Amino acid sequence: MTALALLVAWASVHSNKTVGTRKPYIFLLDEPEICLHPRGQARLLDALLTISKFYQVIVTTHSPIFLHSPAVRTANLLLCQRDNSTASNVVVSQARFRSLFLHGPTWGEICWHAYNMPTVEFHDELYSYLQDRSSSATVEAADKLLRLSFDEMNEHHTPCIWSRKDNKGKNRRDKLTLSSCIRNSIHHPDNKCMGEGFVEKNLEESINIMLRVIKHLRAKEEAQLAE
């Protein structure tokens, strides 16, 4: 906490200095969020963002507070992974974070690529992307787009049954793709028709499915533009 207080104070003082009086510091911090309360992490991030306006700041982090900040979307993000086949055992990658969304990498996307961790946030982002690409931005239209893509990709899929009551109170059983059923389970947690643990058990598979479909749709679009 002492280090946090010093950084906050330092950021406040140096942000008021004129350009000519500032020295060219570079800040290197290795997981500065360790042992900090989430609110403390948020304050630390604010201080580092203030400092980064005037000096270069390089931070290694696993903090969801840091990664969830919209400010991260404009940062220069690097992914460091261990690879025993290289001399240094470390591979640094940047391009992967720029592959999906125009507004920059999201927290869910970073967790997926950096930690191999599927999240409901990333699933929602991918499904929303498919809804935007479909004819009417509805679940039904997105599900139709998924099924059409499966046929074009020659991929077999087993439909899931989503049970619900319609507007007249009658029971309905809809055949939907896995991704649509997970989307519905996330948005309607009171509906237990898929059983306990359905989302957790199938989240990773569904994300992989949608990533393949999005890749297919983009390749199809590029081919049409090239004609």
Regions found by a protein language model. Give the residues of each.
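Acidic, Mg2+-coordinating catalytic modules of nucleic-acid enzymes
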Residues: 95-227
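Switch/communication elements of ASCE P-loop NTPase nucleotide-binding domains
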Residues: 1-105
